[in-house]
Amino acid sequence: MEIKYLLTVFLVLLIVSDHCQAFPFSLIPHAIGGLISAIKGRRKRDLDGQIDRSRNFRKRDAELEELLSKLPIY
């Protein structure tokens, strides 16, 4: 093999091994944060916020439909 192919293969292997080594260590903080939020019950509060946003969206949609129905037809 020529040296440029060997260098290319070496660099690809170096990049892949670096990503594989960093992968488990990036999962640890996310797992800890998920456990803490599950213990504190943040998910429940987030769902309540999503429900409120959904209600507000439906209310705005109904108001928009009412406004459009009142506009004259051109």
Curated annotation (Swiss-Prot):
Record PTM Lysine amide, positions in chain: K40
Principal location: secreted
Tissue: Expressed by the venom gland.
Residue ranges annotated as propeptide in the record: 46-74
Extent of the signal sequence: 1-22
Localisation: Secreted; Target cell membrane
Transmembrane segments: none
Keywords assigned by UniProt, alphabetized: Amidation, Antibiotic, Antimicrobial, Cleavage on pair of basic residues, Cytolysis, Hemolysis, Membrane, Secreted, Signal, Target cell membrane, Target membrane, Transmembrane
An example Gene Ontology CC term for this record: extracellular region
GO biological process, one term: defense response to bacterium
Protein role: Has antibacterial activity against the Gram-positive bacteria S.aureus (MIC=48 uM), the Gram-negative bacteria E.coli (MIC=120 uM), and the yeast C.albicans (MIC=64 uM). Causes hemolysis on horse erythrocytes.
Family: Belongs to the non-disulfide-bridged peptide (NDBP) superfamily. Short antimicrobial peptide (group 4) family.
Protein name: Antimicrobial peptide 2
Organism: Androctonus amoreuxi
Lineage: Eukaryota, Metazoa, Ecdysozoa, Arthropoda, Chelicerata
